Amino acid sequence: MKYDCIVVGGGHAGCEACLATARMGMKTLLVTGNIHNIADMPCNPSIGGSAKGIVVREIDALGGEMGKNADKTQIQMKMLNNKKGPAVQALRAQADNISYPKQMQETLFKQENLTVLEGMVEDLIVDEKTVKGIVLENGEKIYGQCVILTTGTYLKADILVGDTRHREGPHGEKPSQHLSDCLKNLGFQIIRLKTGTPQRVDKNSIRYEETKREDGDMTPYTFSFDDTPEYDVTKQTPCYLTYTTAETHQIIRDNLSKSSMYGGLDDIKGVGPRYCPSIEDKIVRFADKERHQLFLEPTSLESNEIYIQGFSTSMPHDIQEQMVHSIPGLEDAKILKYAYAIEYDSIYPTQIKQTLETKLIKNLYTAGQINGTSGYEEAACQGLMAGINAALKIQGKEPLILKRSDGYIGVLIDDLVTKGVRDPYRLLTSRAEYRLLLRHDNADLRLREYGYQVGLISDAQHDILLQKKNAIKEVLDQLQSYKITPVKEVRDYLETIPTAPLKDGITLYDLLKRPEIKISHIKHFIDFPYDSSILEQVEIHIKYEGYIMKAQREAEKMERLEAKKIPEDIDYNQIKNIASEARQKLQEVRPTSIGQALRISGVNPADISILMVYLKKGEKH
């Protein structure tokens, strides 16, 4: 059998990768260990969150599936940071972890050009540093022009609880034992990482009166820019807030040596996630904190399971019982699933290009947790980009590489391939230097054109984008040309807001720059036939104009450095006077531009100056 693209692993990265290649006309095969676990949510039952919610919007803008799937299956939706500025606002959905995978599986099974096969991949067929296909557990060989590895946490996975170690993946699934060895034998540097998941308790055993109810927003938000089903905001499922206690902390301190991470097992090499620490880590690292917040999150409308967010641990089961029962509201809680840590192999991500193709093996792409990231959203966006670039390569077209000023997806990939990882990488708004440009509300304006160019956005969707851009321009033009003067009617209205009285005439554009003036106030003077998404863009553009222009100038300055390309075959050993650490890092990362070289830790401006002089000399010759 021969395919254009073979995707290995049916998690969130694999789903986006195989859908992208199939929709771009590639004959695609998805191979996964268990077809019933496609798009599974083995950890938190949510999609989105700070920075991550913006990524889901970016995936949708490019033509990916995660946002649409989350909209169809969410049971609660919230806009985070809505009292802060637009740069940090992001959607978070409480996702139904039974219907989310089912819905995604339906989408995959109906997709043209896509075949789904249940099986384990044992080996890669490689000839002259180029991947040619895969070898299944039963010895069957399947050939393909490109292979995309989206193996998640399954490479040599071990489940850790107390002093026990079981060789298995999430939900007791069979791990991939030989693929990791195959990659090592091909010359890849393999690293060991770790993550964890908390307990699930029975919703009928919780004393809710001891917790604080957290409802969804009363605005019907959606991730997708396209038509998705409307939902009744009054029927959202609540979450509940509770806290650890002094008793919880004492139980953990008294039993710390029984935790896999703190003495239960002495052969752990995996490094855990810095921004999602276990409860043991929190108690040790933040010893001065009297309590830590925990969210009780429903996992599905079809299940009694409640996920205790913020309480992941690798303690033995009997200690977990004590810990859970020390929490207000959970005194009588029945544990349905115990918490555990999981250790797994990844490849060090400086070994991949910005296209997500590996540097060592041509036509081999990697996406998701195999690249050292954590989170469904981080995985999905990599899967989408790997799929797009694999298809573009087969089509003989230029790759799609998103800049740091294009989107959080660009930030994530650039961070991975330029800086590498020490622990599972999580996206944060603080990682983006142009975050005012990379907002939740403008992901379609930033990225939909790219999706259209590669063939994942239809003509109809593209027309809607053009209409939106024209409408925004039209409203901005109207506001700049419409002037009001301090006549009595205007003075009286402005007093009701209240805002400072006018001394002279002013355009509505300049009036809207006042902090207390909203677009709704402007409607008193001029009526717009446009929906709220258009007017929101206009308001943000005007109120943050100075900051946005400054960010754009900085991005353009960086783009000029990105345009200064570094030859692929450059030998850094030939460049005199570069510091030895910088030489080593440049040789390892092999940046494609001066802009990227500047972002490598250990490479300082003096090294960059020497490199630029060397490149100029080369141009002359």
What are these regions (language model features)?
Residues 1-13:
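Beta1/beta-strand and adjacent pyrophosphate-binding region of the FAD-binding site
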Residues 3, 137-146:
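Core beta-strand elements of the Rossmann-like FAD/NAD(P) dinucleotide-binding domain
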Residues 19-123, 150-167, 174, 178-180, ...:
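Conserved N-terminal/central alpha/beta ligand/cofactor-binding core
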Residues 23, 379-402:
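Internal hydrophobic alpha-helix adjacent to the cofactor/substrate pocket in enzyme cavities
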Residues 34, 52, 79, 180-321, ...:
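An anion/pyrophosphate-binding glycine-rich loop and adjacent beta-alpha core
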Residues 125-141:
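Conserved beta-strand-loop-beta-strand element in the redox core of flavoprotein oxidoreductases
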Residues 307-373, 401-414, 532-585, 590:
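A glycine-rich dinucleotide-binding beta-alpha-beta segment and adjacent secondary-structure elements
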Residues 431, 448-607, 613-621:
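Extended, charge-enriched "interface" segments that sit outside catalytic cores
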